[in-house]
């Protein structure tokens, strides 16, 4: 098991926009984040991932949510609309398209609201131009990406390929294994993204249907508590003021003045966005108890995975151990920032590192191969795509084939 990290209470800068202990208009009490995340007693609830998204938004003091329906996030977007009808959000409306939604989210964030939206698959790709714009504008918007197939022929089923496209947008990227992860990541994601030394958008990702439409037991804090709201005055860049825009780039591109100014501006700002991702590490480690979880990493064979591939790997490991094959596990929680040093340390003894994924590109295996010494140890796969499940028996069979072990005919 992992060693619990120290959690000094002054590590995270919280909003001082409201006084803790006071109530919002819905009667929820603004609660210290350390108390809400680590101290209050939680009660079990049995619900789908979409319902979990609703519950998280209900206590997150979200100001604006913009929606556009696309499976498998449509239900979550509709449930957030119910929260608006009940009075928990200040603004909620449906955009004209996924591209429009992300632009409208930017406007709300420029105006100082905490902003949450959801998307999936082709919607993510249609909205893609906005994500690096969010990052470059230092907008701490949260988008919940309920990942699904993006290829033709059309598939609405789970596939994590869209995460590959998001890797270089400048956003934080956290990948939830379970509905519990998803709930916690949504709430903690706001806090990390809004830190003054970070202040960039975050994609909280989960595997569509496997998480969004499957019921699971989730431990929830009391619904009469809520996070302190976003404090736009903690932003490292000026808030948007429609009477006095903070910078002329909104109306007058740098390239109109000088190519050199344009080049140097973009180069330095891209470096700053990436530096902000790196600065998020200390806050993320504090709130998520590390960027990875590890189990039995002293073994010669290790599986490294993220999302629901972790769940399938756990059962595959159990089956392998019944045959006397001992395998360790590394669960990756954050894709950006990527846990470079943690993975190198966790896999340093391994002779074989398997990376099962719900996509054919093998983007996670590529990330791992790029950082570990002797990367011939990294075996990309097994892979499934387009909504195929990844049975634990398939993981077992493919691992045994690679290791030159006998494969049972009934597998």
Describe the predicted segments one by one.
Residues 8-179, 187, 207, 376, ...:
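Thiamine diphosphate
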Residues 48-53, 278-301, 314, 318:
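Glycine-/acidic-rich phosphate or pyrophosphate-binding loops and their flanking alpha/beta elements
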Residues 123-126, 148-152, 181-182, 210-212, ...:
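Short gly/pro/ser/thr-enriched loop/turn and capping motifs at secondary-structure boundaries
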Residues 154-156, 273-289, 304-312, 332-339:
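A general structural motif
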Residues 173-237, 352, 356-358, 394-411:
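Structural signature of the thiamine diphosphate
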Residues 201-293:
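Conformationally flexible catalytic loops at phosphate/diphosphate-handling active centers
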Residues 316-346:
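Generic long, charged, amphipathic alpha-helical segments
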Residues 356-411:
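Peripheral docking tails and interdomain loops at the edges
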């Amino acid at each position: 098991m992992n060693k619990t990290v120290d959690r000094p209470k002054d590590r995270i800068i919280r909003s001082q926009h409201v006084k803790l202990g006071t109530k919002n208009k819905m009667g929820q009490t603004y609660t210290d984040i350390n108390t809400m995340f680590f101290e209050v007693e939680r009660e079990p609830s049995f619900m789908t991932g979409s319902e979990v998204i609703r519950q998280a938004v209900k206590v997150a003091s979200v100001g604006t949510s913009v929606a556009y329906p696309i499976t498998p996030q449509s239900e979550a977007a509709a449930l957030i609309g119910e929260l608006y009808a009940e009075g928990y959000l200040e603004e909620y409306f449906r955009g004209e398209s996924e591209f429009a939604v992300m632009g409208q989210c930017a406007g709300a964030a420029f105006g100082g609201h905490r902003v949450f939206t959801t998307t999936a698959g082709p919607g993510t790709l249609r909205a893609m131009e906005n994500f690096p714009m969010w990052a470059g504008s230092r907008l701490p918007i949260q988008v919940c990406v309920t990942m699904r197939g993006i290829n033709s022929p059309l598939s609405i089923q789970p596939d994590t390929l869209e995460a590959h496209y998001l890797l270089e947008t400048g956003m934080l990227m956290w990948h939830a294994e379970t509905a519990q992860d998803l709930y916690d990541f949504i709430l903690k994601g706001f806090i990390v993204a809004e830190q003054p030394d970070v202040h960039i958008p975050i994609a909280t990702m989960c595997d569509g249907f496997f998480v969004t439409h499957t019921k699971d037991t989730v431990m929830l804090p009391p619904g009469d508590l809520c996070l302190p709201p976003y404090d736009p005055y903690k932003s490292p860049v000026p808030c948007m003021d429609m009477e006095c825009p903070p910078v002329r780039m909104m109306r007058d591109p740098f390239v109109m003045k000088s190519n050199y100014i344009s080049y140097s501006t973009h180069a330095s700002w891209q470096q700053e966005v990436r530096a902000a991702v790196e600065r998020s590490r200390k806050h993320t480690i504090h709130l998520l108890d590390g960027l990875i979880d590890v189990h039995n990493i002293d073994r010669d064979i290790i599986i490294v995975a993220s999302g629901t591939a972790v769940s399938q790997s756990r059962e595959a490991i159990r089956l392998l151990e019944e045959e006397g094959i001992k395998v360790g596990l590394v669960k990756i929680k954050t894709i950006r920032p990527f846990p470079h040093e943690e993975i190198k340390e966790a896999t340093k003894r391994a002779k074989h590192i398997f990376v099962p994924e719900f996509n054919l590109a093998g983007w996670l295996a590529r990330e791992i191969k790029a950082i570990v010494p002797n990367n011939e140890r990294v075996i990309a796969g097994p892979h499934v795509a387009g909504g195929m499940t990844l049975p634990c028996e398939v993981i077992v069979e493919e691992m045994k084939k690679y290791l030159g072990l006998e494969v049972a005919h009934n597998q």
